[in-house]
Amino acid sequence: MKPLLLLVAVALGLATVVSVVSAGPEAIECWFVEDAGGGGLSKKPATLLLRHGPRGPPPRPDLDPKLYFKVDDPAGMLLAAFRRYPAGASAPHCEMSRFIPFPASAKWARSLSPEQNCPRALDGDWLLVSVSSTLFSLSSLLRPQPEPLREPVVITMATVVLTVLTHNPAPRVQLGKDAVLDLRFAYAPSALEGSPSLDAGPPPFGLEWRRQHRGKGHLLLAATPGLAGRMPPAQEKATAFAAWDDDEPWGPWTGNGTFWLPAVKPSQEGVYLATVHLPYLQGQVSLELTVHKAPRVSLTPAPVVWAAPGEAPPELLCLASHFFPAEGLEVKWELRGGPGGSSRKVEGKTWLSTIRHHSDGSVSQSGHLQLPPVTAKQHGVHYVCRVYHSSLPASGRSADVTLEVAGFSGPSIEDGIGLFLSAFLLLGLLKVLGWLAAYWTIPEVSKEKATAASLTIPRNSKKSQ
């Protein structure tokens, strides 16, 4: 029994070690940005302490105590995002600034804030924290305590009230496929907030998705679930999951605002802004959607190109068809086999054609190779065109043809099959000719006897008649 208990204890210890190792960073270094006057901005170092050891928060004498924050996250969304942050990943970019609660300015969202003046419960300091990385992007509203704690370390407590989060800040979608833009949000009213309404359950909220492309903003979808009011129609057949996950009476609450865009086109590339509106509070994240489509690669003439010694083979055309984006296509030519046997750069004149556009938004482009005269030693070499594009893996995509030099080609399998069939048909033809010759060489008398014999009626037949 003791060995079993020992194994259980070891397993629990390993699980604890793994959880500690994978718990993400202890603190996030940020920049506190504020107006410096005269149109300029000032930046000061700040830190969000996410967790600490049993000895308490580590001292940070290099920071202003009002910019050293110990984070309390009742909903847990901000802390959960950082717990999954890999240890070897580059540090996320973090900025914070002051935030002033205000009612939503959009007409469709005015029902969220019936009073234009913010409740006194929202008075005090607010911080807007924006974190961006390759793994996630989030925006959080924090409510710091008025004064820092002095013991055991000078630090300011800050409570997370609203978090808006996406786990895929840079989605890449294949041309013609559906785009699903992830969005989650969480809300935990602080004790100081004191909701003016006594109604239990999550508060009303508004969801807004906009796209910015080439400097232009475009509202795609707006929703205020459960509230009356005229909403602008959704554009481009877009839909979204706009709902709280639960209706617990006092929170905290989490919600889903994931956006769905069917059959994306190149014109739908751009930066998408997702905004969650609560009464007098807002959180926003940005996602950059890119559209791609890998090219199909073909090489002509194929699979064999012929040339006589001292003559140039026909021009080779490497076609990269129906790809997107149009920029960044690269075609490289290689020569495999022949003297040396290794792959090397091919000699000849190369160029790219102009881009051809297709109705689905994709494009095609071809690379050309004009070869110099060949020699007998080049018989059997392979000309390879390799296409590189942002939609392809780093190794690219290739097609090849084989050079056959006239007078140096040995019989192939196809040649052997053709010879066998030819011999079989020739043998059959010879037999037929032999039969015909034998028939026509029979003497005429024998033919007449054979004919008379075939016309003689037997006597037995006459009697029967």
Swiss-Prot record:
Keywords: Disulfide bond, Endoplasmic reticulum, Glycoprotein, Immunoglobulin domain, Membrane, Signal, Transmembrane, Transmembrane helix. PROSITE patterns: IG_LIKE, IG_MHC. Residues 1-23 form the signal peptide. It is a single-pass type I membrane protein. The keyword Endoplasmic reticulum applies. Residues 438-465 are cytoplasmic. InterPro entries: Ig-like_dom, Ig-like_dom_sf, Ig-like_fold, Ig/MHC_CS, Ig_C1-set, Immune_Resp_Modulators, Tapasin. Its main location: endoplasmic reticulum. Residues 24-416 are lumenal. The N-terminus is required for efficient association with MHC class I molecule and for a stable interaction between MHC I and calreticulin. Binding to TAP is mediated by the C-terminal region. This is Tapasin. It comes from Mus musculus.
